[in-house]
């Protein structure tokens, strides 16, 4: 799995970042936007491999901002970063689920409403979406009528489902409000009154629509999943043979959810309510789902039936930034952190009992000791300091740690390595770099950051590539102890970024030697 998915995903990460640098070299030329459009196409393709490639977008947006803004400021950089986050959200929470959502509405209309066969609504939706994209590109290219240009753009955004965030009626209300606000902003009369820097030009709209079209074309690779499932192959997990089951497949609903910003701890108890004299757990439903109705006769028309969506329990005790949330991993959490906790009252249907909850400091300690240190920095140091062996560890001093090859440092970290048995000493995964790549990377990092105004801009580009493909993934995954395998493959993009600093370190050393030692450049 790792070789098939993450190697391909790493390729997309490298190519997309290289392409934005190619664009930077020719940004002032007439047809430079084609590099941006190619990036959009590869981003759409990469969605069919893994969503990790979307994490390159903040770095890409910074490159774009610094190139287009000679006198860039910290405020402008922050706005560009916020814009990049909106862009990631528009793809991740807009286009990816939105196409399925709006396609599902068309499917229900044509199958349940008009009595047509399965997938007829999806076919009509795809045709309309393609027509809207082509119309929008044409109108923004010709610039014959600004009103039609705005209408075609808004129609495309609506058909993509980007404004319809959430579930049920609330998503429709949000979508209508967003579309209304966008329509007001793009109205020709409003565009004529606002400052020029905030106007949406035809070129910007055309490029945005072309990029959207390329993302959709790349994203359409998921059609293979539906075609394969329709053939009823022996391996057909979730059977995504229609737009609704495809939505569950894309949402990875079989894996459940993990709390990120606010949620329960491992010792939290389900909130209870008394109803008709019975004590029942409090639950919430995440919308509803539609499944194909089994026919009782061949003459019966195709139709979908509505079923309750995913049901989740609500907990009485919650905390911010919950890192220790899994009740099935409670003993393992206690191996990583000495949890004293604190007692909080819990209403057990009229009976008050005390529940011991980990405090916020213990929660943060687990985040730093396990999730950040063991599940990220350990892998980072494997690549730039050294690796003890390739035996998966769970915190033991003899399995899978990072080392340097420098005895007095390794003795402090994991003990005397000379005392290990021969099978561990001679492990083929054993490798030491004496921290030389790490030192070069740190030199490159500081040299780039303090070299010049151009250098600090380049530093922030590389930093956000490093952060978003590394630590940001750690924050999002919220991993539990005792993972089934080592997860170093997920952070390859972050190691790419630090490798750039390693190369910068070599350049920095040469520059420093040239400056301080008056070293002359040798002839080629």
What spans do the regions from the language model cover?
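Short hydrophobic alpha-helices at membrane interfaces in multi-pass membrane enzymes
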Residues: 26-44, 73-86, 145-157, 523
């Amino acid at each position: 799995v790792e070789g098939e998915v993450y190697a391909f995903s790493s390729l997309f990460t490298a190519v997309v970042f290289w392409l934005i640098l190619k664009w930077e070299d020719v940004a002032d030329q007439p047809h430079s936007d084609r590099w941006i459009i190619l990036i959009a196409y590869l981003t759409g393709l990469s969605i069919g491999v893994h969503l990790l490639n979307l994490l390159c977008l903040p770095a890409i947006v910074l490159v774009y901002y610094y190139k287009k803004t000679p006198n860039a400021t910290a405020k402008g950089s922050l706005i560009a970063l916020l814009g990049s986050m909106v862009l990631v959200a528009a793809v991740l929470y807009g286009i990816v689920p939105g196409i399925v959502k709006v396609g599902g509405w068309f499917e229900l209309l044509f199958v349940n409403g008009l009595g047509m066969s399965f997938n007829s609504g999806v076919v009509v939706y795809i045709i309309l979406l393609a027509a809207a994209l082509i119309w929008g590109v044409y109108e923004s290219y010709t610039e014959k009528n600004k009103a039609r240009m705005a209408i075609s753009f808004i129609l495309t955004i609506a058909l993509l489902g980007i404004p319809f965030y959430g579930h049920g009626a609330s998503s429709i209300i949000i979508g209508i409000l967003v579309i209304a606000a966008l329509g007001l902003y793009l109205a020709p009369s409003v565009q004529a009154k606002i400052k020029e820097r905030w106007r949406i030009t035809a070129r910007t709209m055309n490029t945005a629509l072309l990029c959207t079209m390329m993302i959709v074309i790349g994203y359409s690779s998921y059609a293979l999943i539906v075609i394969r499932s329709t053939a009823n192959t022996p391996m057909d997990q979730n059977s995504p043979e229609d737009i609704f089951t495809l939505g569950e497949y894309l949402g990875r609903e079989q894996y459940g959810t993990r709390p990120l910003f606010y949620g329960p701890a491992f010792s939290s108890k389900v909130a209870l309510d008394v109803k008709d004299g019975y004590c029942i757990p409090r639950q919430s439903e995440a919308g509803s789902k539609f499944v194909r109705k089994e026919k009782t006769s061949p003459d019966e028309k195709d139709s979908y039936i509505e079923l309750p969506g995913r049901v989740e329990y609500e907990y009485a005790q919650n905390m911010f930034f919950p890192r220790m949330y899994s009740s099935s991993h409670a003993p393992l959490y206690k191996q990583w952190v000495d949890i004293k906790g604190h007692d909080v009252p819990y209403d057990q249907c009229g009976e008050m009992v005390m529940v011991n909850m980990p405090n916020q400091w213990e929660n943060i300690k687990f985040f730093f000791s396990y999730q950040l240190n063991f599940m990220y920095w350990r892998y980072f140091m494997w690549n730039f300091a050294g690796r003890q062996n390739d035996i998966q560890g769970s915190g033991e001093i003899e399995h899978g740690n990072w080392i340097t090859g420098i005895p007095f440092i390794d003795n402090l970290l994991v003990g005397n390595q000379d005392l290990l048995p021969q099978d561990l000493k001679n492990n083929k995964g054993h490798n030491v770099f004496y921290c030389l790549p790490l030192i070069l990377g740190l030199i490159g990092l500081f040299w780039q950051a303090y070299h010049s105004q151009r250098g600090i801009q380049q530093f922030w580009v590389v930093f956000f590539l490093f952060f978003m493909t590394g630590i940001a993934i750690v924050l999002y995954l919220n991993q539990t102890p005792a993972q089934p395998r080592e997860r170093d493959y997920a952070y390859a993009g972050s190691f790419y970024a630090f490798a750039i600093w390693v190369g910068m370190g070599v350049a920095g050393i040469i520059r420093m030697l040239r400056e301080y030692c008056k070293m002359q450049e040798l002839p080629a």
